[in-house]
Regions:
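Multi-pass membrane catalytic core of lipid/isoprenoid biosynthesis enzymes
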Residues: 1-28, 139
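C-terminal membrane-associated helical module and adjoining short loops/tails
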Residues: 23-24, 33-183
Length: 183
């Protein structure tokens, strides 16, 4: 580490890159998306921030790079990639939404929305764990105890396990809702 007497193997950079680019990005994206899905069913389409990559790309493609909107177009480019990474992790959710929209349009019945929220509510604290609070606490503690490499291990193991658990439970919830209300 620069300006300290600590020296690490070059492998710390590999571990850090893996934890940051592969694990952290997916964890935050899915935690954010699950909260937006929950808010969609709780508050409705107009009050939730449940965007689709296709709609973002459509808006982005309607703009020109050489215009006053170039910065917004650049923002939409990265936001579309982020939203695409979210959508790629929730295939059952998108199948469920497609079937619900085919059957009910934009008016998903209250009992379906309430059932979905009731079953997804226990997952919301876990989305907080994979988003910010827990990871910041572990980062500061690992630095404070002089073992900063522990944060990368924690990110790559514990938080990945939480992400897999939350994703599995949420995808099974979507499959149950799909079977119960769209067949």
């Amino acid at each position: 580490i620069p300006l300290t007497e600590i020296s690490w193997s070059p492998w710390i950079w590999v571990l850090g890159a893996w934890a940051g680019f592969r694990c952290h990005g997916r964890q935050c994206a899915i935690g954010d998306y699950y909260r937006n899905i929950h808010m969609y069913f709780l508050l409705g389409k107009d009050k939730a921030e449940l965007d689709s990559q296709a709609k973002i790309k459509e808006e982005m493609n309607s703009m020109k790079w050489m215009s006053k909107d170039w910065f917004h177009k650049l923002y939409l480019y990265f936001y579309a990639r982020y939203t695409g990474s979210q959508e790629a992790q929730v295939k059952s959710f998108h199948k469920m939404m497609q079937r619900l929209e085919e059957k009910y349009g934009d008016n998903i019945p209250a009992d379906i929305r309430e059932n979905f929220c009731r079953e997804s509510r226990p997952l919301m604290p876990l989305t907080n764990i994979i988003n910010f609070d827990t990871r910041v606490a572990v980062l500061f503690l690992s630095i404070g105890f002089g073992i900063p490499w522990f944060y990368f291990v924690f990110e790559s193991t514990i938080l990945e396990a939480v992400r897999f658990y939350v994703t599995g439970r949420h995808e099974r919830l979507c499959e149950r809702i799909m079977e119960q209300y769209t067949d």
